[in-house]
Amino acid sequence: MDNVKNEKTTDFQKTEEERSKKEVDRLWKEIGWHRPLGGMLYNYLLLLVVMLPGILVVSVVVPNFIMPYPEAVGFYNVTLSYLQVIFFAADFGLKNASERYIAEYAETKPKKAIRYVSFFIWFQMITGLIQITVISAFSIMILPQTDMGYAVWFFLVYIMVQWPGTIGIFQVALNGFQQFDKANILYVIQNFAIQVLTAVGFIFLGRWYGIQNPQIGELMGATMGFIVGMYVDDLIGLLLGMYFLNNTLRPFGLTLKDAFIISYDKKLAKQVLWYGGRVMPSGLSFYAVSFLITLMLTAWLPNYSTLIGLYYIASTLVGALSMTFPMTAPLSESYNNNKKELSLYLIRMQFIWWGILTIGFFLIPVLLMFPLILLRIGGEFAEASWMIFPLFIPAFLLFPSNFAGIICEACDLPEQSTFMNFIEQGTRLLTYFLVLNPDFGILLLVGRENVVYFWLLAEAPGYIAKGFYGWFIVKKKLFPHNKIDIPIWQTFFIPFLAMLPEIPFVIAMVGVFNLVFALNQILGFIILGIFLISMLYLMPAYVLMPMFGFLGGWDEK
């Protein structure tokens, strides 16, 4: 009798669990802010497990023990600038187009959505082989005759990322199906766990090879290892993306195999290429201008490889200020189904949470804690600490400037997003030219030793020009009869006031770290890890968010 009773209890519990799971799935599929927010919060929890150790390795271990050469990072970024313009032109805007259409059909017609994935995969694999062939021939026959002759092997190794070249589609597909938790897991694991491990391992291998072969040298060997590590990281990320997408497709009666089967037709290919062709000039202008700026830097900026390497470290730390939510899919789903008020709600919530993250969570660590810590433990990269402050201004302007373009792309106005980027890139190119040109402009007024400060601020004018035009278009073209009503007070002022109590705590933390680090470096690093956890988790939970609510951050007006 007891056995029968226990079996009934177990069956009842299983039934309740199944009902609960179905209810959770039903609520999750409802349109709203909970999906972007849930994805972000899920991602934020991963910081402690994966990203925090990655930050410590990149900011402490790498510059002190693994790759104490800012020049190696500079050479890598120069190579990237030369090749990315070609990569993006060959991609033909398919990433943007795929995310737009996958998001539209993911819930209503998943089999149609997977056809866009299939087209992206086959297009990328075929064009990737063409790119590898052409650029390899260029690198072997022409590049040695130029000032970039030292970078021949950098080009030959890095071009391999274009085959199979499909890693991006799995991130796009997960976002399109609004599986932001899986997309965030993929992003964090690849960019902070796998990337660190592969980069460290291959940098050591490259340095060893350079020492064994003096004609190459340790610096060039480290650079080569760094680039190889990036490629291996992409291959591992590709396998992870395939695994996550396969799990996402199962509830729809689909598998990863369906993504590799040629299921698209001429009409779909034409639709995607037409949309991508309208979006592509926007992104292409960025990479083309970045390429021209790289030419200016290598020609006019003394010691460019070191400065570019330091710039990369500083901009990576400042990049936390631009943390946003994946908004293309929810905005596309709401606006293209004639739910404008929902679209406006999503826009307002994005602003509020951007303010919470940028000003509340990251402003104090980025501007106060990171520079002081980097100065102490950064080794050859310590000089990047002074770059953080001028880079803060363009980093803070980036989101308001870019968000208008994201809205236009999601709401089927890609040509306006393209024009916004033309405005930004035109202003950007002119600004860098006026800053770096040795014959006239700012350099003559401030001197060569001070022009670096203006170089660090050179992105800001383009963001400002793009932002003014972008929000004018969003209002005029998309919401002419609706009030956008950006929550200025809740976005900027309340997060700033809410984080002020953290300042004395951070100053005290830095003082304790310096004292302990001087006595015992290992114990100092442990203290640093505890401080980072406090700033990223404890202070927001027990100081920032209660203060945000107390000051009226969640009030409707």
Where are these regions (language model features)?
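Interhelical loop/hinge segments that connect adjacent transmembrane helices in multipass membrane
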Residues: E18, K22-W33, Y209-G229, L238-F286, ...
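Membrane-interface helix-loop junctions in multi-pass transport and translocation proteins
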Residues: Q178-K182, F192-Y243, E415, Q425-F468, ...
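Interfacial/gating helices of multi-pass transporter permease domains
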Residues: R35-P36, V58-V85, A151-V152, I216-I227, ...
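Specific pore-lining/lateral-gate transmembrane helices of multi-pass inner-membrane transport
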Residues: E104-F120, L310-F419
